[in-house]
């Protein structure tokens, strides 16, 4: 959880964010130990700010973690580990996800 991976998101349909891009792993390690899938949130440098998008600076570029585009992917889509987000960014991301999925 909190690692940034380069991930191949293609093929996609409609408004799903596409191409190979950095993504943040948001699922916990306990899931990774038993499943062949991980839950990720794509990153972008071109999107618009919103309450469900967390600002991030990675590799000298400002961007957003797109929590509105989370998805489960097979580990075969993982291309390369690029680093990790800060604890502050991870905490903000998990807070938004919790607010999204709890009544």
For the regions a language model picked out, list residue spans one by one.
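Conserved functional hotspots at enzyme active or ligand-binding sites that engage polyanionic ligands
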Residues: 1-103
């Amino acid at each position: 959880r909190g690692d940034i991976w380069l991930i191949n998101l293609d093929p996609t349909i409609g408004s799903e964010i596409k191409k190979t891009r950095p993504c943040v792993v948001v699922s916990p390690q306990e899931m990774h130990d038993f499943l062949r899938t991980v839950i990720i949130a794509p990153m972008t440098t071109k999107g618009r700010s919103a309450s469900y998008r967390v600002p991030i600076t990675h590799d000298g570029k400002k961007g957003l973690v797109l929590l509105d585009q989370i998805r489960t992917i097979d580990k075969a889509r993982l291309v390369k580990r690029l680093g990790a987000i800060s604890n502050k960014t991870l905490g903000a991301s998990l807070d938004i996800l919790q607010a999204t999925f709890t009544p």
